[in-house]
């Protein structure tokens, strides 16, 4: 029997799967060591850590294996999902800040001013859960983000929107199915009145009018 180094090494399916999981876990670990600071010029204000963890848990609890998830302008929430390394979910980050391309193919450059650009055919009409925080507190921003949602969603898509309460009238105009949740997101550096709303009933998020 030849012991040449040119001989092919064939791994069993179990060994190959374990090796792939190892490399993926190492990739996740390296990506999550990359700290990205807020850029206020891009209207970036990270949530309190507990808020990011809570929302990520909501997404994980209220989706099922194989679901496609989009975090739209919510990189701090995406980071928690990514760190949790839930391989059952297809998590994607839509974000303007190209520093987040550290996440590789899961990063999708997103400019709300061009809400229909750069969306892959694989994601159009195929997203099960969208978590979003429009980058600016304006009607224009809500209107354009709503166009992006329309391209991504299907009839059963769950939406979770986090923003300033001042946007509620605009949200009702462009996303009329949304309901105000009991849960309130927190930002350590902002004093604005923040809230969240969803288009589905969530035991974890609650409903404001049922306090």
Swiss-Prot record:
Organism domain of life: Eukaryota
Subcellular location: Cytoplasm
Location (main, coarse): cytoplasm
Entries under Pfam families matching the protein: N6-adenineMlase (PF10237)
Broad EC category: transferase
Gene Ontology CC entries for this record: cytoplasm
EC numbers on record: 2.1.1.-
GO MF terms, alphabetically ordered: protein-lysine N-methyltransferase activity
Keywords assigned by UniProt, alphabetized: Cytoplasm, Methyltransferase, Transferase
GO BP terms: methylation
InterPro entries, per the entry: Efm5/EEF1AKMT1, Mlase_EEF1AKMT1/ZCCHC4
Family that this chain belongs to: Belongs to the class I-like SAM-binding methyltransferase superfamily. EFM5 family.
Function: S-adenosyl-L-methionine-dependent protein-lysine N-methyltransferase that methylates elongation factor 1-alpha.
Protein name (Swiss-Prot/TrEMBL): Protein-lysine N-methyltransferase DDB_G0272708
């Amino acid at each position: 029997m030849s012991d040449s180094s040119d001989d092919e090494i064939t791994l069993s399916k179990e060994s190959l799967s374990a090796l792939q999981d190892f490399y993926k876990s190492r990739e996740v670990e390296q990506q999550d060591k990359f700290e990205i600071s807020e850029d206020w010029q891009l209207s970036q204000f990270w949530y309190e850590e507990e808020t990011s963890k809570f929302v990520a848990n909501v997404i994980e609890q209220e989706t099922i294996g194989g679901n496609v998830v989009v975090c739209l302008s919510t990189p701090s929430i995406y980071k928690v999902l990514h760190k949790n390394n839930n391989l059952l979910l297809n998590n994607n980050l839509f974000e303007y800040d190209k520093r987040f391309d550290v996440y590789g193919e899961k990063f999708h450059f997103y400019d709300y001013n061009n809400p229909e650009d750069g969306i892959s055919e694989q994601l159009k009409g195929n997203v099960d859960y969208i978590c979003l925080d429009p980058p600016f507190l304006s009607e224009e921003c809500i209107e354009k983000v709503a166009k992006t949602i329309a391209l991504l969603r299907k009839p059963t898509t769950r939406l979770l929107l986090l923003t300033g309460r001042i946007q509620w009238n605009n949200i009702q105009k462009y996303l009329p199915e949304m309901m105000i949740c009991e849960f309130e997101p927190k930002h350590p550096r902002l004093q604005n009145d923040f809230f969240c709303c969803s288009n589905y009933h969530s035991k974890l998020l609650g409903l404001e009018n049922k306090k």
